[in-house]
């Protein structure tokens, strides 16, 4: 996946990235990009949820249930979103419906095999940490991982969206999020 991104950037003459925004499981791909590729990145924003650390057996057990949950979003045209997430906001339904449509069991299994691992976090340079934000919603389940992330990335920025759940601020206030 990383090499596909590198080829795409190269084919389009992109030599520097202004901002990477990564959330949930996709943040593992962003972290791999940041640690393996030498293309300069000016700013990074991570939603805190991807820093959950879940054991291998639990992740393996999660795959069929998560697969059915994600596929149900497509099959139901988004009606099951409120059962899976904290919201059923019409702004995000199309993205989840499309994700459910395109999801394959094998891809999800591979993604969870190397995501959310219970292992040390990847190293980032002091300079990149200063321009990186790890956001957590104060009421999201993954808030409990915030201290471990703060101890690893001591030069980073750690805003807390008070009273918000996982990705809730970004979805409900995209203008405020982009100003931040």
Residue ranges of predicted features:
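Gly/Ala-rich beta-loop-alpha elbow adjacent to hydrolase catalytic centers
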Residues: 21-30
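Conserved alpha/beta-hydrolase catalytic His-Asp/Glu region
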Residues: 56-58, 73-126
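Active-site loop/oxyanion-hole signature of alpha/beta-hydrolase fold enzymes
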Residues: 1-19
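Conserved serine/cysteine hydrolase catalytic core
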Residues: 113-150
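Catalytic histidine neighborhood in serine/cysteine hydrolases
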Residues: 152-167
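Flexible "cap/lid" loop of the alpha/beta hydrolase fold
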Residues: 35-71
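Short, hydrophobic alpha-helix immediately C-terminal to the catalytic nucleophile
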Residues: 30-35, 178
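Catalytic histidine-centered segment of alpha/beta-hydrolase-like enzymes
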Residues: 164-176
